[in-house]
C-alpha cells in the first residue's frame, strides 16, 4: 500500500503463501483470521528446508482506501501486500489463472507450487508437515 514494489522472487528460499483476496469478498474476509493464525504460528518456525514463512497478499481491489482499511481491520500484519487496483484484470490474477477468490498457492523454497486453496486448519496442518 505504501507504493513500494514487492517481488515474489525476493522471498525465494522461504515457504510463501500467495493469498488472492479483496476487501469486498466476504469469504476472503471470513478466511483472514485463519491466515493470520497460521502467520502467527509459523512466521518464526524452523522448516526442514526453507528459511522461514511469509505471506504475499494480492488484492483484487479497485479502491485503495477500502483495501488499506481491510488490511488494518483484519490485522494482516505481514509486510507483503500488493495490488494494481485493477480488479479482475489484475496481472497477478491472470498469471496464476485466478478466477475466484479466496485463492491461495503455497510455494516451496524453490518457487514451486506445492498446494492450492488451503483453508482453515488445512493450511496449518500442511505447514506443520514442512517444519522440523
Question: Where would I find each of the regions flagged by the language model?
Answer:
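A short beta-strand-turn-helix
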Residues: 1-16, 41
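Flexible loop/turn segments at secondary-structure boundaries
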Residues: 4-6, 24-27, 62-66, 89-91, ...
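Conserved Rossmann-like nucleotide-binding pocket used by diverse enzymes
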Residues: 7, 16-21, 56, 82
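Conserved helix-turn-beta segment immediately C-terminal to the redox Cys motif
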Residues: 15, 32-58, 131
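Conserved redox-active cysteine motifs that mediate thiol-disulfide chemistry
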Residues: 20-37
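Extracytoplasmic/secreted envelope proteins and their assembly/folding machinery
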Residues: 36-39, 64, 68, 124-127
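Short, internal strand/loop/helix patches
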Residues: 56, 63, 68-102, 109
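Thiol-/selenol-based redox modules, centered on thioredoxin-like
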Residues: 101, 106-132
Amino acid at each position: 500500500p505504501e507504493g513500494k514494489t514487492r517481488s515474489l522472487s525476493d522471498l525465494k528460499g522461504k515457504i510463501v503463501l500467495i493469498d488472492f483476496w479483496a476487501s469486498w469478498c466476504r469469504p476472503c474476509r471470513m478466511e483472514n483470521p485463519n491466515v493470520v493464525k497460521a502467520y502467527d504460528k509459523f512466521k518464526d518456525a524452523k522448516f526442514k528446508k526453507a528459511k522461514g514463512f511469509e505471506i504475499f497478499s494480492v488484492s483484487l481491489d479497485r479502491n485503495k482506501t477500502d483495501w488499506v482499511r481491510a488490511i488494518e481491520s483484519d490485522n494482516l500484519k505481514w509486510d507483503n501486500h500488493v495490488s494494481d487496483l485493477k480488479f479482475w484484470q489484475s496481472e497477478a490474477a491472470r498469471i496464476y489463472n485466478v478466477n475466484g477468490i479466496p485463492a491461495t498457492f503455497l510455494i516451496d523454497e524453490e518457487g514451486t507450487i506445492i498446494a492450492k486453496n488451503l483453508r482453515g486448519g488445512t493450511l496449518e496442518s500442511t505447514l506443520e508437515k514442512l517444519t522440523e
